[in-house]
Amino acid sequence: MFYETIFNFFNSGILLFWGLLLVFPKRRLTQKIIAYPWVPLGIALGYIYFLSITSGTFSADFSSLNGLTEMFQNANPQGVAAGWLHYLAFDFWVGCWMLKNSQEKAVKHPWMILPLLCTFMLGPVGVLIYSLVLLGHKKLIAKTT
């Protein structure tokens, strides 16, 4: 089915971009990727596509845990794909911001590997770890000056 091809394209393709952030953070291509949100915007197009072919998304009750549970229980593959692309886009955007921010603050890249991996796999956990890295970096800078 066509929607499975689109899902696989985004789901597999994002691995290449995360790999660039992790392995080649200073390369010109990586710097372009973190400077402009083209990758998350591209994923957003896939997200819009899946939303457009998903029925019932906008009638879901987002105000209660029961409403969200019901939405997930009744989800079709297109709706699940839309949700997954939502995660891919936001997590990657956050990863790009973290890498760019860490480079501006002169955080050594080995300190960024765990936060980036956790952002890719666990979203907010990566942001928490990055915040701790920044706190430690700030204390280290203060200690040496």
Spans of model-derived segments:
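Hydrophobic, aromatic-rich membrane-embedded alpha-helical segments
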Residues: 113-136
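Structural signature of hydrophobic alpha-helical transmembrane segments
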Residues: 5-13, 81-85
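Loop-to-helix transition at the N-terminal end of transmembrane alpha-helices
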Residues: 28-50
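Helical transmembrane-bundle signal
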Residues: 14-21, 43-50, 127
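Alpha-helical transmembrane segments of polytopic integral membrane proteins
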Residues: 16, 92-99
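N-terminal signal-anchor/start-transfer transmembrane helix
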Residues: 9-31
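C-terminal TM-helix exit segments that contain a strictly Trp-centered aromatic cap at the helix terminus
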Residues: 47-58, 129-131
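Short aromatic-rich membrane-water interface segments that cap or initiate transmembrane helices
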Residues: 1-2, 68-82
